[in-house]
């Protein structure tokens, strides 16, 4: 073949003419027409090579390659453990309640695990203060709770928060007295703080709207009497401890009794009957206290019978 290698296959017409020329033994001199045909052939070859070069660019890594549908990574939900780590307290609590509602057979197992836990008194107080704050926040903005003359509209608006607070308070008190808690000092201190929280709650102008408060204070009075009974029976605590501790509780109880219109009079009298003096005085005071406790239990039973025969509210936490 005559001429240079141009990097492409020559046209069939050119090849045939070249072969025929060589066959005759004549030397073929490229003319202008042959050069023009080669130029056209070169352009056609470049057009054919261009799509192939694009494919090379596409599949060679320079251009982006569209992934096949089978190789796509699909999103998936979090595992159970990771999801529970992200859930807040309310979400976990609601989840547990829903599970126990749908599967009642697990309630006993959950309850057994819960009562086996040892919750600190400070944690209970923190929870009570949060619920007490919710009561204050539910007060209508146009009425002041300091006057203790909230109207019926305020009672309707505050009732859910009040019942939630009182229910929580009663549950925590029952969990922090003997035999659940054997430390009488801790029980008295916790009961003292709970009584103060109830006494300081805003009251309503209509007496019937204060029913839940009064009923709660009556129940607190029974708890006070119960703890005083434990103190009277434990002579070691009664004689060994500093009398100023008991007098401090008695002084605070007297203040609470004044703010509750005498609803705490009975435990106050029982406290005063305790004599933190000599052993003989303590023994005599214990006998008189036992007589007072018998009267207290009889009175409590009579009151409960009267309440059961009456028309008490169905949503009261103390019935």
UniProtKB/Swiss-Prot annotation:
Statement: the UniProt record of this protein carries the keyword Cytoplasm: yes
Role: Involved in ubiquitin-mediated protein degradation. Regulatory factor in the ubiquitin/proteasome pathway that controls the turnover of proteasome substrates. Targets proteasomes to the nucleus and facilitates the degradation of nuclear proteins.
Primary location recorded for the protein, binned into one broad class: cytoplasm
GO MF: proteasome binding
Biological process annotations from GO: nuclear protein quality control by the ubiquitin-proteasome system; proteasome localization; protein transport
Keyword Ubl conjugation appears in the UniProt entry: no
Oligomeric form and interacting partners: Binds the proteasome. Interacts with karyopherin SRP1 and Proteasome subunit RPN11.
Protein family: Belongs to the cut8/STS1 family.
Stated name of the protein: Tethering factor for nuclear proteasome STS1
Pfam families from the UniProt entry: Cut8
GO cellular component: cytoplasm; nuclear membrane
Keywords, alphabetical: Cytoplasm, Nucleus, Protein transport, Transport
Compartment(s) where it occurs, according to its Swiss-Prot or TrEMBL record: Cytoplasm; Nucleus
Region (Disordered): 33-76
């Amino acid at each position: 073949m005559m001429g240079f290698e141009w990097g492409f296959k020559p046209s069939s017409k050119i090849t045939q003419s070249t072969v025929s020329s060589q066959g005759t033994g004549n030397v073929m001199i490229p003319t202008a027409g042959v050069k023009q045909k080669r130029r056209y052939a070169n352009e056609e070859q470049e057009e054919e090579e261009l799509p192939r070069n694009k494919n090379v660019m596409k599949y060679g890594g320079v251009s982006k390659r569209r992934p096949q549908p089978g190789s796509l990574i699909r999103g998936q939900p979090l595992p159970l453990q990771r999801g529970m780590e992200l859930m807040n307290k309310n979400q976990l609590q609601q989840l547990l309640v829903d599970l126990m509602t749908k599967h009642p057979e697990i309630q006993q197992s959950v309850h057994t695990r819960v009562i086996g836990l040892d919750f600190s008194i400070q944690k209970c107080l923190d929870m009570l203060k949060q619920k007490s704050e919710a009561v204050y926040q539910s007060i209508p903005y146009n009425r002041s709770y300091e006057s203790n003359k909230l109207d019926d509209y305020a009672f309707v608006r505050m009732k859910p928060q009040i019942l939630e607070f009182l229910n929580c308070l009663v549950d925590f008190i029952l969990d922090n007295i003997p035999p659940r808690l054997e430390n009488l000092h801790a029980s008295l201190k916790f009961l003292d703080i709970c009584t103060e929280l109830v006494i300081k709650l805003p009251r309503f102008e209509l007496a019937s709207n204060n029913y839940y408060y009064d009923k709660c204070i009556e129940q607190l009075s029974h708890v006070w009497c119960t703890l005083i009974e434990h103190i009277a029976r434990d002579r070691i605590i009664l004689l060994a401890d500093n009398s100023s501790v008991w007098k401090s509780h008695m002084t605070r109880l007297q203040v609470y009794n004044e703010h509750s219109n005498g609803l705490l009079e009975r435990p106050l009298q029982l406290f005063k009957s305790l004599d933190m003096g000599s052993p003989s005085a303590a023994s005599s005071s214990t006998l008189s206290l036992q007589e007072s406790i018998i009267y207290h239990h009889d009175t409590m039973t009579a009151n409960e019978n009267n309440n059961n025969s009456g028309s008490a509210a169905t949503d009261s936490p103390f019935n």
